[in-house]
Amino acid sequence: MYRKPSRQMTLDDFSLPFSGSLSTDNRWVRLARIIPWDQIEKEYAFLFPSDRGNVATPVRMALGSLIIQAKCSYSDRETVQQITENPYLQYFIGLREYQVQKPFTPVAMVKFRKRFNSKRMAQVNELILKAEADQQPVAALIDEEKHPTNNHDDDDTNKPSGTSTAGTELTQQEEPAKPNQGTLILDATCTPADVRFPTDVGLLNEAREKLDEMIDILHQGLGKQEKRPRTYREIARKRYLTLSKQRSPKGKQIRKAVKQQLQYAKRNLRIVEQLLDKSSKQTQPSGLNQRYMKLLSTIRTLISQQTAMYQTRSHRIQDRIVNLHQPHVRPIVRGKAGAAVEFGAKVAISLENGYSRIEKLSWDPFNEAATLVDTIERYRQRHGYYPEAIMADRIYRNRDNLAYCKKHGIRMSGPRLGRPIANMAIKKAEKRLEQQDARERNAVEGKFGEGKRKYSLSRIMARLKETAECVIAMQFFVMNLEHKLRVLFVQILSMLFRRQNTAVLAEI
């Protein structure tokens, strides 16, 4: 059940002890002003259609706590602790007065991330970008009212007498398509998950240890009616350490160790299945909990994949598991000097006027060039026209994308196809244009750098698939909020300078 607050609180509604007051210049107060809480609440209330049960957490508290965590890179416990100690953070999440009690437990942060998944965060992000787009025509209209021009007449004397409503509708229907406007910058990156660098021997050893834990639990649940099955855990551990302590083991040694750990893991898996069968036949079954059953399913898949790769002497397989606790994580080949392979989600984004949108988020590798057409079509749906130019990497310049851009009159950055131009003047002009495009495309590289250095895009700490996607989407959402604050500051500053110049000219 969701209960909507009577109205969204303002700064004057928040009460402090000892007759204090909050500063209007605080960063959290300014940030709370630019977020459309009422519009987000309308979408959030649909998650709770029932009118029974406990009252859900308000949207400002749920989303606000996630924004605080993403902006400051806090853990769940630290986020709750900071909110408890800071009155500005309590105002930001919608509390009416300062309180010393914790507004919620750290476990609630996981529920908040599940509610605001990547699709819902994309909708919230669009509300912010739409509000910014709506402010630009208003600002232009205000400037036009302050500085009117004489290029148009307000009287109707010059209008033809034969006009009608039907004629107006016909004129609107026959209006030609709008010319291409704007610049769209595209790029993709990998957001690494918080996983250890995987090796075949290490994964099999970890699977063997987890199966040993399951055997202990199942054997204890059976009441120790029989002797515990032999698993050779000490010998298996010793053989694993023999290889892992070597600096550069040879290929034959690695293959031998994989075979040994694979045999130990298969033996433990057979024992677990036998104990599960015995446990199900009891009057009071005492099997594994949901977490262990999910882990057991992942281990089965891992053993199957490792067996197939060992038999075929290959190191590649589809949907390869690289972590037992995060089976959705896949290896992403980047081919860069720092990290040839990263393990996490791949994100393709578009940058428009400094604001970023997630065009595609996938845990499986994909070619970002395939997202160009859909990205341009979504741009056209938002604005009613195609972009004038596309700034993208060379991987986007395949034949299909170039033909699509040529068909719709869109210029794509990069060198032209075909033979080099003999005319030196044209060649120099194209070279200058390529350099200018490269400078403009640096904005998206800076956006990735901002997310990975200032925020937590360089390591996603969330372990569940849906919560990790929420964390990734939240990082770009917070960066858009920060950019909006910077744009708002520049607009206010330019307005002050304009008024000052107007006053000086009036005195002259």
Language-model features, listed with the residues they occupy:
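Electropositive, glycine- and tryptophan-enriched low-complexity nucleic-acid-binding patches
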Residues: 336-383
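Basic, amphipathic alpha-helical segments enriched in Lys/Arg and hydrophobic/aromatic residues
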Residues: 292-298, 303-310, 432-508
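Charged, often Cys/His-bearing segments associated with DNA-binding zinc-finger transcription factors
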Residues: 1-35, 42, 139, 151-164, ...
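Short, conserved catalytic/metal-binding motifs centered on acidic residues
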Residues: 26, 65, 79-83, 105-112, ...
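Flexible, glycine/threonine-enriched loop-and-boundary segments that flank and lead into catalytic domains
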Residues: 323-338
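Acidic, metal-coordinating catalytic cores used for nucleic-acid/nucleotide bond scission
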Residues: 52-57, 87, 391-399, 418-420
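Basic, short loop/linker segments at the boundary and entry of helix-turn-helix/winged-helix-like folds
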Residues: 22-67, 72
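Active-site- or DNA-interface-adjacent structural scaffold in DNA-acting proteins
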Residues: 96-326
